[in-house]
Amino acid sequence: MCGESVSKTECLKIMFKKILIANRGEIAVRVIRACHEFGISTVAVYSEVDRASLHVRKADEAYSIGPAPASESYLRGDKILEVARRTGAQAIHPGYGFLSENANFAQACADAGIKFIGPTPKSMEMMGSKTRARHHMEKAGIPFVPGTARGLTSTEEAEEVAERVGYPVMLKAAAGGGGKGMRLVHARNELRSALESAQSEAQRSFGDSEVYIEKAILNPRHIEMQILADEHGNTVWLGERECSIQRRHQKVLEEAPSPIVDPEMRRRMGEVAVKVAQAANYTNAGTIEFLVDQEKNFYFLEMNTRLQVEHPVTELTTGLDLVHLQIRIASGEKLPFAQSDVSIRGHAIECRIYAEDPDNNYFPSPGKIDVLLQPSGPGIRRDSGMYEGWTVPMDYDPLLAKLIGYGTDREQAIMRLQRALDEYFVAGIKTNISLFRRILRDSDFRAGKLDTGFLDRMLTKPEADPATSPPEPRIAAIAAAMFAVLDPSNSVTKNGNAPPQLASQPAASNWKQKGRAEALR
């Protein structure tokens, strides 16, 4: 577990005894499980609406840090550090989102003598701003999309750069992510209003109105490379992830490896990714994102200085546990393998299961989960933060779980994932499960013909013949029957007595009904 150079006993001696997880949902559960596998005690933090959340139930200790708004709870680094000090936590794992890429919080952890499981504040600050990152990468000779390496100072400057690189161009928030502060501009007469709009949205979303401009690559693929770097100067790449299936610039389905990346291209992308990380003196887990044009040229986009939502597809195709490795790196251990030891085996595809209503433009769908049937079986992994009876709050990102299918090749991964999606059933709230069933049936997806516009095009196509769709009514009927039997108000009571029978119904045996109920539990 701890590598050839360090025995398991020695490794556990130098490891942390207690880690605080500064996050919620499925990623908090994921990190808690990794800690427990090492015998490390865990501390959860939660907002008032998350008191009954799964991560709170799984942790060894849990502490409230404030009201529902993230600005009063999960973004309050001072409260989180106070809990860490009070509980004796030696390290903090930030997960993704919230404070995971906040250099000030990472510095506050260092000042408090608590290890931040991630990069140094200096590396995070360098790569956290897209304009700063582009400036440093330009000096390091890293290829990036033509445009500005610094924020725009005026509309006139934007017009000058746009004329030089050629329309269409993309405006992007320097501190951005998730599609916020981004505008596609096709002509000069659109530029002024688009710039004002992008700057305004960037200020609202990130507290920073800085925007830069770059040439828009038409129909690009979004492909990223996972890296790991220890604190002894060793950096390796772990293969790419195809992240082109997006909605509103946010990923919804990812896979590894990419259908278009051959071994030579993978090696070149990996070497550039390592060069990026080394230029930033980067340590721990990180991801370098690239745009890839139709000629398979790739350009540096940005670096995510944290664990990614989609890390499971890399874990399945490399056989490595990235959270284990994050903890080991943070505890001072060298990487237990070299680049030559890394191999890509099989294929993995991840679906992000959201509490969203596909019939209402994917609007968030909070509420109580009345029935939950989750899939399993060969080649299926679930990273979940939900359970039956839990109420999904409206205050956070609606990600409920991640469903990952793994196979010896892409075709088998798709087959397994389709079967698992057909088994998945959630009642009480809306989810986007039906969207993934549709994606996996799409002929372009099956052929690997992907780019960032794939999903928009697919959603304009007519739905498949209902006869070829999965038997959702049958699944719903089974789930409803289970719910009816398990609900004491509808069926057998706890003392074994059946509810009153209608005159037209034959009397049911209390023992039989009790047995059926127990069999379904």
Model-flagged regions — what are they?
Residues 5-7:
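Serine residues within intrinsically disordered or low-complexity segments
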